Amino acid sequence: MKFTNLNNLSLVKLFLKVLVFVAVIFNVHAAEIDLNKILPMDNKITYGKLDNGVTYYVKNNQIPKNKAYVELVIKAGSLHENDDQQGLAHLLEHMAFNGTKSFPKNKIDSYLNSLGLSIGADFNASTGFTKTIYKFQVPTNTIEPLDTGVHILSEIASELTLEDEAFERERKIVEEEWRMDLGKFDRILEQQKPYIFKNSKYLVRDPIGKMEVIRNFKYQTAKDYYHQWYRPELMVVFIIGDIDQKKAEQIACELALHLLLQYN
């Protein structure tokens, strides 16, 4: 591109000078950072690791008022899939919305609606290369929603119903998600991936998976992934919000106890 206008040329020169300045400053500060130094824990956070391996973090944060954010992290994602499981970490995340032992079918949705909450806005999930995250936002003007929300997460971690008809529904939903991601930007990114992820497993483990696998996987193959990677020592629980910190810690420990009973 040619810049014939002097004002445009001046702007380009100014931009380049700023870019160089920022790069120099960044390098100076980067040189001062010890990347091996462990960051200190915020002393306002209560945390612990229980005997069954579950780690928890609890923090009181009064903004916004009367709300808490609860998150269950499974330290496994698409990089942990076998070749015949590509896309099943993500599909299993979808299965959490199809029922657990105490909340079969659409009972989770019904419970949320009774609190004025909804799937998507207040209960959601995501799957990445190295982790799968389930997250709740609940009111805390009474303790029951927080208690029940954590109980639902504990059942997602160990007692998904994984019914055949739900698997069939989710095949179609995941394929539709894949189809919606076939836009211009995504096609460009697809062309760049061999250069970005060269000689890396990231290149062949996109969380959306392979549609050949999604269309044809056996139910047991998905269940095998669930039982292999949804283990207490790979789970982290976060409870943050306008809460009684000791009570929230007790609830986190109850979740871990529930998992201990399920895995023994």
State where each predicted segment sits.
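Histidine-acidic residue clusters that define the catalytic metal-binding segment
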Residues: 31-46, 194-235, 245
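Active-site-adjacent, His/Asp/Glu-enriched structural segments that form or flank metal-binding
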Residues: 74-89, 94-186, 223-234, 251-254
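Mature N-terminal segment immediately following signal peptide/propeptide cleavage
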Residues: 38-71
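Glycine-centered hinge/linker elements that transmit conformational signals in sensory
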Residues: 251-264
